């Protein structure tokens, strides 16, 4: 049976419905429809290093056209680096605080992670949308929001713990 032939809550499960929910950032529905957490894979590239100067060094992850990204916003994610999963908050956006007309980037801030991983292929597992993209009037306002996002990300993981058995399985 193909994906388009299945149903969830009396509605057809098809790629159009999944893409629509991805565009909306509705990862709960996407993950329910798929039966697993949505993932994308990309290579960590050098960026502008602005996150590091703000106290939030990010992995700038390339995004291939084969993957449909969730809508613009900030998300609770897990990022797999060298076979190990890390809790993260990930932004998909144009960094509008720093100018207009910028390209869409995927930037993951891995919690409790200090390694340089340029050139590494990573997998991003998308769990929950925290908020949309905001244009801040000041860098101080952005940093304040990033601190709140980090707290919200940690709170999400505390409220949705992964069991030891599941953690061992996903780290295989």
Predicted regions and their residues:
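Contiguous mid-protein beta-loop-alpha structural module that forms a pocket-lining wall or clamp
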Residues: 1-33
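Long, positively charged amphipathic alpha-helical accessory segments at protein N-termini or as interdomain linkers
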Residues: 9, 14-15, 37, 81-82, ...
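Short, well-structured alpha-helical segments that form the helix of a local strand-helix-strand
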Residues: 29-35, 142, 146
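Residue-level detector of secondary-structure transition/capping positions
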Residues: 37-38, 150
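Acidic/polar loop patches that form or flank catalytic/metal-binding clefts of enzymes
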Residues: 31, 41, 87
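Phosphate/ribose-recognition catalytic cores of enzymes acting on nucleotide-derived substrates
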Residues: 3, 46-172
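Short amphipathic
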Residues: 39-47
